[in-house]
Amino acid sequence: MARLGLAVCAASFHLFLLLASTSSLRRAPTEADTANHARRTAYHFQPAKNWQNDPNGPMYHNGMYHLFYQYNPHSALWDIGNLSWGHSVSGDLLNWAALDTALDPTSPFDANGCWSGSATILPGALPAILYTGIDASKEQVQNVAFAKNPSDPLLREWEKPAYNPVIALPADVPGDKFRDPSTAWLGRDGLWRIAVSAEVDGVASTLVYRSKDFVRWERNAAPLHASRAAGMVECPDLFPVAERGEDGLDTSANGAGGVRHVLKLSVMDTLQDYYMVGTYDDAADAFSPAEPERGDDCRSWRRLDYGHLYASKSFFDVRKNRRVLWAWANESDSQADDVARGWSGVQTFPRKMWLAKDGKQLLQWPIEEIETLRRKRAGLWRGTRLGVGAVQEIVGVASSQADVEVVFKIPSLEEAERVDDPNRLLDPQKLCGEKGAAVRGGVGPFGLLVMASGDLHEHTAVFFRVFRHHDKYKLLMCTDLTKSSTRAGVYKPAYGGFVDMDIDDHKTISLRTLIDHSVVESFGGGGRACITARVYPEHVATSSSHLYVFNNGSDAVKVAKLEAWDLATATVNVVVGDHHGLVAPALELEPTRTTQ
């Protein structure tokens, strides 16, 4: 951490006093509230208790990170009429303090719920929130709220003007299909723009609205995107990316050279997030995809994640000049389990996103702050040969709370499984189900067995397998949950996607996996393919988990490099300290300004 100047130290101490004394902080939960449970995460974002779903309005303001989220303050279950905006603050995107809810359903224009939306920093450093309200007639309308005191580092109070809604339900849109306003961007004509999801005359549409003052909005005649086949889409996110390099761009960035745009949509029918890279013309408010052959049906676009991820939301982190992604990872067991735990839903670990060199796909990687949680490291492996059927344990790390990075070297692709029917390659998830980790292959399956019991009766397999179709090789990445738990009533699919890279070129493939009790996030090929999974092994109630590297192919593979670390537990919304519920001194929430 950079050395802080005297002024910053004073500001940090002042902020600590604010946090320690404010009534907005939630008091220390009871033992039942905290759900000190083997499946509760240690460094993923989740409230101390109750239901959460979509991430809303992430932003960096006055030296603090803010994350809002869909939250039911009264229950661990989703409830249409009780959704509020939860609110937490952080100095490092790792440790979080929970504040009082920012928005509650208290007005006629949101009487039946404060649903998803976004935050925008207006001129004069005024934070504004646009969100969907379910009004007294149970119709979806778009509302605005402003920070009551923009100089408050915690932004504890928000005002909802009486003139809401700022966008009423359009006549050609059903009352229950008009929601999720995006972060606003400023066009070169000086007008603000937002994207809103709607179903217009039966067509899934991403509408564009313009405004001079952030209060009076006019709809653009043509939608930004429309798909007759996709069904209702949600949580639109339009953002710029640099054509070269990993730096992020402000949401309003535009220009003829050096900038592309990404349109991300969440599809209700599949509960998956899809995106397309392209160009955006702010004069016509038109988006042109870089891969038009994928068609208008966004279900044929690229997947943001091939696993259990939905309703993602990105923001530009001006502090570190990067674009950061959040997303909801719902539970995969039953509502009865949610009630018994007292909580439901986590956010994926924040990811940095940037454009790959091919200009067509995004790369995603855990933000660098996670490295500050690394503690004990397992022995470094280099050049270890994994023969046919090899299963080797990675010892020396707490396997239920770890960060694992491994690079596999494939000596030869000659034994890659041949696929004559190209239709078999159209559904990678189905292929992962048919060709699981236990099914002997040619080149692969090889990878990791995580959250495994000592006898391997329970394990989650994260692996690769190479196929050959004519003279081209296809690299499949899978997360197989079929053996993840012996419990009944748990959703245990095999997730999968193809890694868009030329495996024939270098014959190496990297895998990084974050393990956090019930969450397993994996990044293949340097972040070209990502898979998020929720797992619920039974053995954790009585014994420790194990971590293995394996190869079940008919050809040997090499572990060119393997490193694994224990990860420390972050302080995430569960307020700890003395009996008064004060913030723990270890919770770093100082403003991140620097002085010379």
UniProtKB/Swiss-Prot annotation:
Compartment list: Secreted, Extracellular space, Apoplast; Secreted, Cell wall
Keyword entries, A-Z: Apoplast, Cell wall, Disulfide bond, Glycoprotein, Glycosidase, Hydrolase, Secreted, Signal
Binding site for substrate: 51-54, 70, 78, 115-116, 179-180, 234
Residues annotated as glycosylated: 82, 330, 552
Signal peptide positions (record): 1-24
Major location (coarse): secreted
Catalyses which reaction(s): Hydrolysis of terminal non-reducing beta-D-fructofuranoside residues in beta-D-fructofuranosides
GO biological process assignments: carbohydrate metabolic process
A GO-annotated cellular component: apoplast
One Pfam family it belongs to: Glyco_hydro_32N
Active-site residue list: 54
EC number(s) reported in the record: 3.2.1.26
Keyword check for Translocase: no
Cystine bridges: 432-478
GO terms assigned for molecular function: beta-fructofuranosidase activity
Matches recorded under PANTHER family: BETA-FRUCTOFURANOSIDASE, INSOLUBLE ISOENZYME CWINV1-RELATED
Family stated for the protein in its record: Belongs to the glycosyl hydrolase 32 family.
Function: May play a role in sucrose partitioning during seed development.
Name this polypeptide is given: Beta-fructofuranosidase, insoluble isoenzyme 7
Organism: Oryza sativa subsp. indica
Gene (UniProt): CIN7
